[in-house]
Amino acid sequence: MIAPDLTMDIPTELGRVHFVGIGGSGMSGIARLFLAAGHRVTGSDSRDSDAVQALRELGAEIHVGHDAAHVGDADALVVTGALWQDNPEYVLAKERGLPILHRSQALAWLISGQRLVAVAGAHGKTTSTGMIVTALLEAGRDPSFVNGGVIGGIGVSSAPGSEELFVVEADESDGSFLLYDTAVALITNVDADHLDHYGSHEAFDDAFVRFASAASELVVISSDDPGARRVTARIEGRVVTFGEDPAADIRITDIVTDGPVAFTLTHDGVSRRAALRVPGRHNAINAAGAYAVLVGLGVDPDDAIAGLAGFSGTSRRFELHAEVRGVSVYDDYAHHPTEVRAALEAARTVVGEGRIIAVHQPHLYSRTQMMAGDFARVYEELADHTIVLDVFGAREDPIPGVTGALVSERFADASHVDYLPDWQQAADRAAEIARDGDFIVTLSCGDVYRIIPQVIGALERPAGSAQPAASSRPRE
């Protein structure tokens, strides 16, 4: 994988900007903002998608497949850390000496000078960002924003606004969240992840200390998460804490998780009851952090509570895709044991008497090797049956001996898990197990959502009918 130079000087003028992997959730949102700012945007992606089509309709010229010819007369290349070094567009840009910008560099360049709210943390970033944006709009504000997923009720992951206020989901995975000139920082948690980049828990903490210390106006940070508490102890300036901790500045109590979550927020001695349209205890926590940011931006506390009630979720966060013969099929972005726990606990609050059938696609060889036992314990505790696919390697080369079997082999009761690297077999198995009232939930930040049409097809086939020939994951 490539490692963009995050310290490079960027030209003051950029005309045509070429995005490699433009269809990704983060990249497509940034490309949309470049188009809105009047730049000529071109790009390439390995496959067509709704995101690609939407950008074309806005004026972007996008190719399916990668070829050096696509670079053309571009003034700069925008990439992610998941790009392979032999990508022909990257190779040509490097030969020409073109600026090659990480997506966060490109965004930081574009929004320079605006009042920036940056949301970071190992879990909950996309949801928290979506909550802040939704509530600001509900309160009559008009920020620009870019999020890691499409925000329900808004229908896009990014949009320009009329205010000099920008809300961004900041990516800590490769340290690029340190590029932003942040005014208000929200840290949802500091649960160690991405150690393939940072190398140690200490280095991971250090990055968040730098991120928080750079915020010029306000730091909002969890008081429940041990990692966040370590960071809080090392920073100065205006800090507002949130959580169930009795010492939190904004305290959460009386959480009710039977269906959409409801809870009480106590701030400056005043308690307010809040209710969301999304399930899960973790979303009460996310909402408390978002509330703190909103009040810090001058939103009336009652308006903040009302605005949060309008949030209906984001794409790939416990997102319902279909209901077939009484079986609900959901997808979730969870790819860390903590996130899987939150997603499955949320599912448990709404499934009623039904069962949860989890389809887990391990993400990254290094994470699978390090956390296989943690994943197995969470799935065995909270899912009624788990189907494990093979590893989605993303930016990593394979590690010998590391497959999805590492997770399935850690189950104490092997009857509760299947390791099925063949996607059609996995879809058929999920449909075979499922009955009226059950949930099938796919979980990963890889491409596991692409198995959903196969799951739906398997559910729609009459019992005992012939099944299609088994196949691996859908081809690009």
UniProtKB/Swiss-Prot annotation:
Localization of this protein: Cytoplasm
InterPro entries on file: Mur-like_cat_sf, Mur_ligase_C, Mur_ligase_C_dom_sf, Mur_ligase_cen, Mur_ligase_N, MurCDEF_pg_biosynth, UDP-N-AcMur_Ala_ligase_MurC
Lineage, top ranks: Bacteria, Bacillati, Actinomycetota, Actinomycetes, Micrococcales
Pfam families hit by this protein: Mur_ligase, Mur_ligase_C, Mur_ligase_M
Residues at which ATP binds: G121, A122, H123, G124, K125, T126, T127
Recorded metabolic or biological pathway in which this protein acts: Cell wall biogenesis; peptidoglycan biosynthesis
Record's keyword terms, sorted: ATP-binding, Cell cycle, Cell division, Cell shape, Cell wall biogenesis/degradation, Cytoplasm, Ligase, Nucleotide-binding, Peptidoglycan synthesis
Name the record gives this protein: UDP-N-acetylmuramate--L-alanine ligase
Gene source species: Clavibacter sepedonicus (Clavibacter michiganensis subsp. sepedonicus)
